[in-house]
Amino acid sequence: MNVNEDGKVYDPSWLVLLANEQLPELDWLPEALNVCRHIHAETSAYIYFVDPTNPNEPGSDWSFQENLILEDPQEGTLVLDILTNHRVGGIEFLSRLF
């Protein structure tokens, strides 16, 4: 995993559009994605927007709640890790796993 100490800048606008189109009933999701502007860490198939150290442990920033799925014509299936308080912890690009 490549940890970006300074928070590599990220443009989530394409994700906001997908969320508005595919999950309009989740009115909080576009704004939750819009604040994902710095990458904490990344692998070839995953972008972390929140520090994943000690997930779901007391004091950890990463407290998992659910997964949401978006489909992108170029990137394929995207799995969003949604944390407590409607935060997006990261995105897994399933097409990059194979």
Language-model-detected regions and their locations in the chain:
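Short, compact, well-ordered microdomains
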Residues: 63-98
